[in-house]
């Protein structure tokens, strides 16, 4: 999936970067980032380095050319520079990041996943009954493995919501209303309404990956 395809998931204010093989070089990391790698296995180290280095490149486009990206104290969350919200996502063969200034959008979320079918039990754990019913009847084209796309939408929505709400959510805590013809969706928390949090997103798929982006205005 190309950087251009992922960029189209977001408004113009959001900067997207896709990691390259060169980004797996951990010698490019800052000391505070290297310290986080600890006993990671080699594959995870490359994944971590790729995400941080791609994020630094995205931040450079927003005016933070040499930012260090440690974790928040007591958390696994990335500690973004003041005035920035960002989201890093990775799956086999694809690592990407989305960043935005908080003066333009309140939050952002990105999720990329390998394409492929999910088992019935997993689908039921991800999708609410009304989502299953609505998407099964969609007249607009969707991939055959559309439940995985719903997974990506909810992951992206959660990544946008959590920094704002600090709420730990299950998949069923979030409901997505999908406009398949526009490849867009809205996400809400029906059991814990927060009308001030308008989560809007877009999605994309190809033969290899599915992806979703989400923003809170």
Positions of the model-derived regions?
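Core catalytic alpha/beta fold that binds nucleotide/phospho-ligands
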Residues: 1-217
């Amino acid at each position: 999936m190309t950087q251009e395809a992922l960029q189209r998931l977001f408004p113009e204010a959001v900067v997207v970067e896709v990691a390259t093989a060169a980004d797996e070089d951990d010698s490019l990391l800052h000391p505070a980032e290297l310290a986080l790698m600890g006993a990671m296995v080699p594959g995870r180290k490359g994944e971590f380095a790729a995400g941080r280095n791609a994020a630094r490149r995205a931040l450079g486009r927003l005016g933070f050319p040499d930012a260090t990206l440690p974790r928040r104290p007591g958390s696994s969350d990335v500690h973004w520079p003041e005035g920035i919200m960002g989201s890093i996502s990775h799956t086999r063969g694809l690592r990407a990041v989305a960043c935005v200034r908080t003066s333009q959008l309140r939050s952002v979320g990105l999720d990329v996943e390998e394409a492929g079918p999910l088992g019935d039990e997993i689908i039921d754990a991800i999708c609410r009954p009304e989502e299953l019913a609505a998407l099964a009847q969609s007249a607009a084209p969707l991939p055959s493995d559309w439940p995985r796309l719903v997974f990506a939408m909810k992951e992206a929505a959660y990544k946008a919501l959590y920094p704002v709400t600090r709420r730990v959510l299950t998949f069923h805590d979030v409901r997505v209303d999908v406009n398949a013809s526009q490849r867009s969706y809205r996400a809400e928390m029906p059991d814990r309404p927060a009308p001030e949090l308008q989560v809007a997103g877009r999605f994309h798929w190809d033969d290899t990956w599915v992806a979703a982006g989400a923003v809170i205005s």
